From Swiss-Prot:
Expressed in flowers and roots, and at a low level in leaves and stems. Detected in the cambial zone of the vascular bundles and in the region of lateral root initiation. Low expression in the vascular network of the petals and high in the stamen filaments and the gynoecium. It comes from Arabidopsis thaliana (Mouse-ear cress). The gene is OPT6. It is a multi-pass membrane protein. This is Oligopeptide transporter 6. GO terms for cellular component: membrane. The keyword Transmembrane applies. Keywords: Membrane, Peptide transport, Protein transport, Transmembrane, Transmembrane helix, Transport. Induction: Induced by primisulfuron and abscisic acid, and weakly by 2,4-dichlorophenoxyacetic acid (2,4-D). Not induced by salicylic acid, hydrogen peroxide, reduced and oxidized glutathione or cadmium. The lineage of its organism: Eukaryota, Viridiplantae, Streptophyta, Embryophyta, Tracheophyta. Its main location: membrane. Involved in the translocation of tetra- and pentapeptides across the cellular membrane in an energy-dependent manner. Also involved in transport of glutathione derivatives and metal complexes, and may be involved in stress resistance. GO terms for molecular function: oligopeptide transmembrane transporter activity.
Length: 736
């Protein structure tokens, strides 16, 4: 049944055993019962089942306008009664007793370690398979056929490649107490609420009771933003002041404009793109807020009203690509029969244009890349070097949780990860040669993508482990291959998923390892659950995506879908546009000497200088401790999810993050310690369960409630996407 020791490890709470991060000290228990069975029959059944269900549901909702992401927390809660039921009804008989292969279907009470591994399976299903974007782009946007086998191989190799990078860097990103991975504390707290025998204080309630109340309330409430009153998703009241004014619409729209005053009374809107605001450290939330305000309320409007890059010819906020006259760009017309750029048609059609905000976000992506490198070097470089040297030293001071894990369990050998890594790279090389006509990526592109991934994984890992924000570095992969190997959109997409998404997947695995670290799960058992969960998830995600593309008419095609359709695929749209800019047309014709946006490259320099200025300020003014909390990669990368995320997602998220991260944490510390993460889990679960119920009971049958609160334009700002330049004609917009 896995690695079982024979001792219970209590830990005295002296100064040496205190965690360096207060939130971890308040949340994570310092005890371990290493005799608990882990790899049980019910763990495999419930874990694989949860993985299948979440994979299907999340891929199903991936294509929706507000893509609901059902986290592993939902399954974490749902399996508890099932686990206890199996513990009561399964036979306790031992099979093959007396041999090394003996096992039982029921080793006793359902325990927290089984529960954690089931959740790891669920997390595999909850995390998206990013390579499905390639399927969507080719089949739905480029309107090309795609064989299933190479598509599936790309999907599975993308996910598995991250294991290799995770194995190489887990010692530096899991064992140190400073690498605390804030979002894991939600699940740790929830495990405590579901398994601890907690005594209710007089006049209060246990965490389990509190969780159930939140779950029921969230479940009941979500019928309003999810079905009866969808306007609650984005209330843009500023537009009501003058609904016929384009300026007012641009300022107030939460979905198509700057979102001033816009707010969503919908947990899905709040947590859709940035995750739970209750799990974000205050300093990270402040950095996100500053970055959002700078971009949305200073840089974007200034650039727009100064008409930089003919900004007024296009919407102020859009991820679409445009022609010089403001009309949509016909991408399919510039592709030749070999799926390459048709240069003759492109020169006749004209260059690609984009909205001001879209151009600014690309510039911020450039700045985030250089800022990440410089920030980690100046603020964390010495620590990383010390950890690297100390990895081979004995008797060094370790975090209390690391000491418990090393005492009770065997580590996962590095060679396990290396074997997976090398075999996976070999398979990718085979794909690039044998299916080159489909993937367009040469063998040397595979090696270059791996080099980028292995270089940036530790840098982004440090940021994610300490701030709960992972700056997106997809632009570097797109930029590099776009210059070296232009005019091939599929090659660009494949290079991005191998170079960038494998790194993201690695950080997911490392985060799960940290969860196992906190919950004292045998590392080898954790490894097995991660590998199995990933394989199951890839199969289900691929099958679901393939089915939906065949099942839903005009999926993702906003020109043919009804105006109130929920199948608009905002994330796939951004991915497709990126493949056009970086892959089909190439960065040289957009951001290089042949393009109109070459000045955006100055953001690279700005991003590199900014962390140096902050670092110098910390040295010049050491008494001002707030300066060290200015985190440039998080600040400039705050809007990395925009688009497809919109202003209302950020404004709503920030309000909740400040309420709980500052006021409640500061003035109601006892309440925060006991209930904060449990509240987050309850809101997630309630919204998710009601969403599933609404779809199964009403959505599949097309039953709708028609009234002004459910109109197609949910944020009531119909003119927010209108251009303001003279003579530009767009359907539904006034002409100046």
């Amino acid at each position: 049944m896995g690695e079982i020791a024979t001792e219970f490890t209590p830990v005295m709470d002296d100064d040496d055993d205190r965690c360096v991060v207060p939130e971890v000290e308040l949340t994570v228990p310092k005890t371990d019962d290493s005799t608990l069975p882990v790899l049980t029959f019910r763990m495999w059944v419930l874990g694989i089942g949860a993985c299948i269900v979440l994979s299907f549901i999340n891929q199903f909702f991936w294509y929706r306008t507000m893509p609901l992401s059902i986290t592993g927390i939902s399954a974490q809660i749902a399996v508890v009664p099932l686990g206890h039921l199996m513990a009561r009804v399964l036979p306790t008989k031992r099979f093959l007793e007396g041999t090394r292969f003996q096992f039982t279907l029921n080793p006793g009470a359902f325990n927290v370690k089984e529960h954690v591994l089931i959740t790891i399976f669920a997390n595999s299903g909850a995390g998206s398979v990013y390579a499905t974007h390639i399927l969507s782009a080719i089949k739905l946007y480029y309107k090309r056929s795609l064989p299933f086998l190479p598509a599936f191989l790309v999907m599975i190799t993308t996910q598995i490649l991250g294991f290799g990078w995770a194995g190489l860097f887990r010692k530096h990103l899991v064992e140190p107490g400073e690498m605390w991975w804030p979002s894991n504390l939600v699940q740790v707290s929830l495990f405590g609420a579901l398994h601890e025998k907690e005594k209710k204080s007089r006049g209060g309630m246990s965490r389990t009771q509190f969780f159930l109340i939140v779950l029921v309330a969230s479940f009941a409430y979500y019928i309003f933003p999810g079905y009866l009153f969808t306007m609650l998703t984005s209330i843009s009241w500023v537009c009501w002041l003058n609904p016929k004014s384009i300026l007012v619409n641009q300022l107030g729209s939460g979905e198509h404009g700057l979102g001033i005053g816009s707010i969503g009374f919908d947990w899905v809107t709040i947590s859709a793109y940035l995750g739970s605001p209750l799990a974000s450290p205050l300093f990270a939330s402040v950095n996100v807020a500053i970055g959002f305000v700078l971009v949305m309320y200073i840089v974007t409007p200034v650039c727009y009203w100064l008409n930089i890059y003919d900004a007024k010819t296009f919407p102020i906020f859009s991820s679409q690509l445009f022609m010089g006259n403001g009309s949509r760009y016909d991408v399919l017309s510039i592709i030749d029969s070999k799926f390459h750029l048709d240069r003759v048609v492109y020169s006749r059609t004209g260059s690609i244009n984009m909205s001001t905000f879209f151009a600014v976000t690309y510039g911020l992506g450039f700045a985030t890349l250089s800022a990440t490198i410089v920030h980690v070097l100046v603020f964390n470089g010495s620590d990383l070097w010390k950890q690297t040297r100390g990895a081979f030293q004995k008797n060094k001071k370790m975090d209390i949780h690391t000491r418990i894990m090393k005492k009770n369990y065997r580590e996962v050998p590095l060679w396990w990860f290396l074997v997976i890594l090398l075999l996976n790279i070999a398979l990718i090389m085979f794909i690039s040669v044998h299916y080159n006509a489909t993937v367009q990526l040469p063998w040397w592109g595979v090696l270059l993508a791996c080099a980028i991934a292995i270089s940036f994984t530790p840098l982004i890992g440090v940021i994610a482990a300490t701030t709960n924000q992972a700056p997106g570095l997809n632009i570097i992969t797109e930029y590099v291959i776009g210059y070296i190997y232009p005019e091939r959109p599929v090659a660009n997409m494949c290079f991005k998923v191998y170079g960038y998404i494998s790194m993201t997947q690695a950080l997911t695995f490392i985060s799960d390892f940290k969860l196992g670290h906190y919950m004292k799960i045998p590392p080898r058992s954790m490894f097995m659950a991660q590998v199995a969960g990933t394989l199951v998830a890839v199969v289900v995600y691929t099958g679901t995506a393939w089915w939906l593309m065949e099942e839903i008419p005009h999926l993702c095609d906003t020109s043919l879908l009804p105006s109130d359709s929920q199948w608009t695929c905002p994330m796939d749209r951004v991915f497709f546009d990126a493949s056009v800019i970086w892959g089909l047309v190439g960065p040289r014709r957009v951001f290089g000497d042949l393009g109109e946006y070459s000045n955006v490259n100055w953001f690279f320099l700005v991003g590199a200088i900014a962390p140096l200025l902050v670092w110098l300020a910390t040295k010049m003014f050491p008494a001002q401790t707030w300066i060290a909390k200015i985190h440039i990669p998080v600040l400039v990368g705050a809007t990395a999810m925009m688009p497809p995320a919109t202003a209302v997602n950020f404004t709503s998220w920030l309000i909740v993050a400040f309420i709980f991260g500052h006021f409640i944490f500061k003035y109601r510390r006892v309440w925060w310690t006991k209930y904060n993460y449990v509240l987050s889990g309850g809101l997630d679960a309630g919204s998710a369960f009601m969403t599933i119920l609404l779809f199964l009971a009403l959505g599949r049958k097309g039953i709708e409630v028609q009234w002004w609160g459910n109109s197609g334009d949910r944020d009531t700002c119909p003119l927010a996407s209108c251009p303001t330049a003279k003579g530009v004609v767009v359907k539904g917009c006034p002409v100046f």
